[in-house]
Structures are given as C-alpha cells and as structure tokens.
C-alpha cells in the first residue's frame, strides 16, 4: 500500500512539474507543420474563445504562440496540427529572438476573431471558389452574402470581405462566345437580371456598379477586402466605368457608349489605372490589366512567382500578408492570372511578382482607413481550372503555400494595431 502511495506521489509530482513547465503552445509554420491550413482555423477558434495569440512574423514560417490551455491542446490534437508544448523560459527566449533588432522578425498580437463575409451567389456555378474551400477546410466560420445584402447595408456588420470569380462589369465573365447556349449561362443571366429588377436597377451592370461602389466605401471606412481572379480586375474596371457603358448589347440590351474608353475615371479605382477595356463580347478578356503567361511558361513545372521580403518591424502589414514556409510559389492560371505592372497605381505595394518583374501576382494597398488585397489566379492547387472541373480536395494539399496566402488575409484584420514607427 505504501509502495503504491509513493508511486502515485511521484507520478503526480512529475505531472505537476511538466504542467508547470508547459506554459505556452507553439504552432510551428515551417516545413515541419503537418497541416498549415487547419492551423489558421485553430488560431481563429482560439481567438473566438477569448484568448490572444501571438503571430511570430518570419519565425519558422510565421508561427503562432499562445498561452497553454487544455482546450486548445485538445483542438490541436483533433485537427491533426503539429504543435509543441514549451515552458516559460523557452517562450521568452523565442520572443527575445523575434524582437531582437538584429533579426527581421516581430511579434503581432491577434486579439479578436474577424467577422468574415464571402461575396458569392447562392446559384451553383460550374467552378470552385478557392476562399470558400480554404475557409471550409480550415474550419473558419463565415457568412455568405451577395448583391441584396450589400445594397441593403449589411456589409458594415463584417470586418473582412472576400470576392472571387465575380464580374462587376455585368458581362457574366465574358463567357458569351463559348457558353452563351449552355444551360448554366442562360440561368445565370436570367437570375442576375431578375435580381437587378427586384433591387430597383434597370440592368445588371448598374446593380454591380452599385455593389462595387458600396464595397469601395466600406474599405474607405476601415474594412478589409480580399479579391481573387476576375473579382479583382473587374472590380476596378466597373468603378472606372461609372460614367459610361462598356457592356455590349448581348449583355445589357443596349449599345456601348461610343467614347467609352475615354470616359473611364481612374481616380476612383483602387489598384489599377490607365488600362484599356475590351468591349468585344466575343473576346474572353476584360482589359489589358491581365497578362496571360507566354505559351512556353503555361506549365505548372515552369510557372512560378516570388514573394517579396519586408521589414517585419517597420512594415508589419505586407509582412503578415506574405508569411509562408516557402519564398517561391507555383503559379496558377485564372481569368485574371497576373497583373501588368505598368497598370498598377504607385500607392499599391507589390507582394509577389513573376520572373522578369513585369507582371504581378499578389498586391495590396491602403484606401482610406482600410486595406485591399488582390491575388491573381483561380485555384492555387489546380493550374488550369476549367469550367465544369470538380473542386480541389484540400485534404490533399494541407500545406499549400498558395492557399496560405489566402488565409494570411483572414487573420490580418485580427491584428492589434501598432503605432507607426517614425
């Protein structure tokens, strides 16, 4: 009996010592991580429980650290995320390393989970949405909204808005030439026209312009917007065309403005300027903002882009947006694949560019009190995502660098604002 008592005593003492030393949880985001994407969802879940998380910029791929909590540890185990239990001494040593002036690292405190809205139609369309898939796989909650919710003022209820494969010019993705007789295309146009009338607009392009202008004002007021693929360039094209008509009659029932190109207003756009719009309904292109890779580079084995490295202590925003375990990422195509650098406004920060430096894949900029991020391409793990292709299974791409960039944007609004260094 006495022997059992001492065995229990030493077991409890040892367990207590382990607990006393394990005061923090470190979630490494370097190549050792087993599921990078779910790690973001775990961080979001932790914030939702009222606990802060430190984002260790440029430390082991942009790792996360939080105070030890049994509930957090349980979630990490359930979700299959690699983590380390560390003591106070180790945690402080990491913070000292990250905050050292000699290292290009810093710590950003994440304090509150952002309220996320995804702008997407209820109608099922024959292509996937990379952000919807990323949020779903990472287990990050979101609310799906569309035109009605935007024009009725609901956007102010959210901190972060995502746009993906959308056409804000009212030209239905410029799919007319190839798909105008496809049932899904006909239904898309019928549904959009009915919704525009129900919301008090004469045509779809007018509704989409109102939506784009409302989103722009949302960003000016302090919101965060992330757009991919055609959701990025058509957003600015629609804003620029607010005084004119760039849509052919097959899209909106009336003629183009004869001087439409000269009537574009680049003062109200967010990222792009001085672009030429394509008003040919038979051309699968909206403008010369987008640049397709040359034919010899339209290959996943040769198409890539490189992220820029920023000063973590002086430029925390672009540093957060580019956290990754690799610096060079595989390219991927979309209706808007990469942006022509000469069309980008000087107020925009380039985050990632293609070889040669003439085209940009990833960018961000401030507008008023808010920020926007544009990301070229459709699906980071499907080089050519054709109409009708099945959605990507992210369980097969748990450490996708391309999808990590999307999820960096999800956490960015949770960061505690630091005073600007002078």
Feature map (PLM): residue ranges:
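Positively charged n-region of N-terminal signal peptides that target proteins for export
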Residues: 1-4
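Catalytic beta-strand/loop cores that center a nucleophilic Ser/Cys/Thr
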Residues: 129, 136, 233, 263-385
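Bacterial N-terminal signal peptides
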Residues: 7-17
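Alpha-helical scaffolding within the catalytic cores
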Residues: 99-104, 148-150, 357-361
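Catalytic cores of eukaryotic secretory-pathway lumenal/extracellular enzymes that build
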Residues: 200-201, 240, 249-251, 257-262
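Extracellular ligand-binding/catalytic regions of CAZymes and related secreted enzymes
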Residues: 23-65, 245, 343-422
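Helical hinge/lid and interdomain linker segments adjacent to catalytic or ligand-binding clefts
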Residues: 24-25, 30-34, 64-74, 124-232, ...
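Hydrophobic targeting/anchoring helices
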Residues: 22-129, 138
């Amino acid at each position: 009996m006495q022997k059992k008592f001492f065995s229990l005593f030493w077991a409890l003492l040892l367990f207590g010592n382990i607990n006393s030393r394990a005061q923090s949880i470190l979630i490494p985001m370097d190549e050792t991580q087993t599921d990078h994407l779910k790690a973001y969802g775990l961080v979001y879940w932790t914030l939702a429980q009222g606990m802060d998380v430190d984002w260790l910029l440029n430390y082991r791929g942009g790792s996360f650290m939080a105070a030890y909590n049994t509930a957090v540890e349980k979630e990490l185990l359930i979700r299959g995320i690699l983590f380390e239990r560390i003591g106070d001494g180790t945690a402080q040593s990491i913070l000292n390393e990250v905050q050292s002036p000699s290292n290009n690292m810093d710590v950003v405190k994440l304090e509150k989970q952002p309220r996320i809205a995804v702008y997407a139609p209820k109608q099922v369309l024959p292509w996937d949405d990379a952000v919807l898939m990323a949020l779903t796989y990472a287990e990050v909650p979101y609310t799906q909204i569309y035109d009605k919710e935007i024009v009725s003022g609901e956007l102010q209820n959210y901190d972060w808005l995502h746009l993906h494969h959308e056409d804000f010019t009212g030209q239905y993705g410029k799919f007319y030439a190839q798909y105008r007789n496809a049932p899904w295309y006909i239904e898309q146009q019928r549904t959009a026209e009915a919704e525009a009338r129900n919301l008090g607009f004469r045509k779809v392009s007018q509704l989409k312009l109102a939506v784009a202008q409302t989103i722009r004002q949302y960003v000016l007021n302090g919101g965060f917007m992330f757009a991919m693929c055609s959701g990025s360039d058509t957003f600015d094209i629609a804003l620029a065309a607010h005084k004119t008509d760039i849509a052919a009659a097959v899209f909106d029932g009336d003629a183009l403005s004869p001087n439409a190109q000269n009537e574009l207003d680049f003062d109200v756009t967010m990222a792009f300027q001085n672009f030429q719009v394509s008003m040919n309904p038979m051309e699968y292109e909206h403008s010369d903002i987008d640049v397709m890779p040359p034919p010899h580079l339209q290959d996943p084995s040769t198409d890539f882009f490189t992220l820029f490295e920023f000063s973590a202590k002086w430029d925390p925003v672009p540093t957060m947006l580019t956290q990754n375990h690799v610096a060079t990422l595989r390219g991927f195509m979309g209706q808007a694949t990469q942006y022509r650098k000469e069309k980008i406004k000087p107020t925009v920060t380039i985050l990632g560019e293609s070889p040669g430096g003439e085209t940009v894949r990833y960018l961000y900029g401030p507008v008023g009190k808010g920020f926007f991020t544009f990301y070229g391409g459709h699906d980071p793990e499907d080089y050519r995502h054709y109409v009708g292709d099945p959605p990507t299974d992210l369980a097969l791409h748990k450490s996708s660098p391309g999808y990590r960039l999307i999820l960096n944007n999800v956490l960015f609004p949770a960061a505690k604002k630091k005073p600007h260094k002078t």
